[in-house]
């Protein structure tokens, strides 16, 4: 996956080996402007799953802690070697940018992936075991929706290209990525990939998640707060749109999800089907 993600779009161009080594010896170190920052972060993110799951495989196969630590080091060393190899192969795929920055980003991703397993891996295993062992359908739905909520938060922050100075922030405003209007500019923009309809759909799982919890007045506060906090978190991310109309649409989606859970006696029997769970995990 790391190789495939690092070579997209696949556009092979043959290069002589002598030229490839000459270019490799001259790969630059770039000053990371806002245009390159998202690509740099992506190079780190693409290595995290490989490091995370390979460390997890070693963790599960060997019960001895010293061996687990040793194999984590082996995984880290192997992926650290793989990162510059991938960067070297990118010389044959000219749409890809080859730089020392990307090598550093890949190494950071390896360290983060291994560290994330050691911090969260055991909890993830226990949660998955509880999910499989329980026969409580509502609890299973709650875990599935909770995972969707975490994915939504990650999507809302991706590609993590934070603005670092006032000029970049003004450029984001100039591009129309901050909008304080209560309604979208046009009806057509409501259905775009960055429009309010997407915000409504993104926040619907949060309403379902809160609705499945015990009924508390505080949950209603969270239904209003979560859409606002998500949009607020997107303000310092250069490529993300933060709009008041999305806050309103998100609140509608959250309350819609909450309302669906309050009438779940009508639809929850349909959820207890094999095709629902297969589709949910896909």
Explain the meaning of each model-derived region:
Residues 1-282:
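Bulky hydrophobic segments
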């Amino acid at each position: 996956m790391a190789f495939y993600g690092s070579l997209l779009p696949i556009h092979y161009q043959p290069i002589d080996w002598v030229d490839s080594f000459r270019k490799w010896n001259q790969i630059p170190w770039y000053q990371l402007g806002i245009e390159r920052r998202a690509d740099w972060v992506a190079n780190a993110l693409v290595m995290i799953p490989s490091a995370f799951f390979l460390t997890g495989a070693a963790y599960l196969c060997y019960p001895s802690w010293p061996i687990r630590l040793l194999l984590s080091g082996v995984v880290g060393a192997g992926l650290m070697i793989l990162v510059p190899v991938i960067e070297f192969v990118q010389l044959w795929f000219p749409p890809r940018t080859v730089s020392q920055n990307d090598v550093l980003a890949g190494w950071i991703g390896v360290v983060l992936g291994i560290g994330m397993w050691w911090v969260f891996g055991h909890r993830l295993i226990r949660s998955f075991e509880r999910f499989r062992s329980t026969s409580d359908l509502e609890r299973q739905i709650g875990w599935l929706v909770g995972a969707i909520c975490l994915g939504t938060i990650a999507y809302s922050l991706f590609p993590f290209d934070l603005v670092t100075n006032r000029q970049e922030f003004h450029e984001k405003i100039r591009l129309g990525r901050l909008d304080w209007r209560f309604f979208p500019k046009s009806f057509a923009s409501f259905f775009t990939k960055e429009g309010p309809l997407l915000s409504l759909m993104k926040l619907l799982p949060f309403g379902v998640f809160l609705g499945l919890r015990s009924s508390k007045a505080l949950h209603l506060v969270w239904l209003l707060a979560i859409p606002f906090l998500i949009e607020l978190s997107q303000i310092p991310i250069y490529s993300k749109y933060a709009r008041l109309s999305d806050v309103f649409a998100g609140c509608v989606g959250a309350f819609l999800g909450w309302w669906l859970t309050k009438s779940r006696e009508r639809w929850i029997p349909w959820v207890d089907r094999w095709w629902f769970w297969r589709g949910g995990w896909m």
